[in-house]
A protein has these predicted regions:
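C-terminal transmembrane helical hairpin of 12-TM major facilitator-type secondary transporters
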Residues: 8-55
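Transmembrane alpha-helical cores of Major Facilitator Superfamily
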Residues: 15, 46, 77-85
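Loop-to-transmembrane helix entry/capping segments in MFS-fold secondary transporters
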Residues: 69-79
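A gly/Pro-rich, aromatic-decorated transmembrane alpha-helix motif that marks the paired
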Residues: 85-97
Length: 129
């Protein structure tokens, strides 16, 4: 699917990440037997791993299709570096928010961030020819 529209893959992955975060947050309100076991959270984590692979595929495919042959390696290297720096920054902020808000509300905040990412991806121009 990324060969047809990497922009749509990015959008759909953002929506799926938001759904996973909201599902994980909702587990806190399940009856004790469900929220006391690790399995519902393990399922959400497994789904998030799949969604993360979609985000990575969509991002790299979008960059490769957008860049010309002579700039492709530069764009991918820059994208990887910026992504790594953003992960460090957002990871630090997420840790602080997790201490302040608690896990459930942190997942809600992350869901809104994923929705914002999906909206941003939906506004990207198509680059596939």
């Amino acid at each position: 699917r990324a060969d047809r529209s990497s922009r749509q893959v990015l959008r759909d992955a953002g929506l799926a990440a938001a759904a996973c975060c909201l599902l994980g947050a909702a587990f806190a309100w399940l009856p004790g037997a469900w929220s006391a076991t690790v399995w519902p959270y393990a399922l959400v984590y497994a789904l998030l791993v799949i969604v993360h692979a979609g985000v990575r595929l969509g991002r790299k495919t979008y960059l490769v299709d957008m860049a010309g042959q002579d700039r492709r390696a530069l764009y991918v290297a820059l994208s990887n570096s910026v992504t790594g720096a953003m992960l460090l920054l957002v990871g630090s902020v997420t840790g602080v928010l997790g201490q302040w808000l608690g896990t459930t509300w942190l997942l809600v905040v992350l869901a809104f961030m994923a929705l914002a990412a999906a909206a941003s991806a939906a506004r990207l121009p198509e680059v596939e020819s």
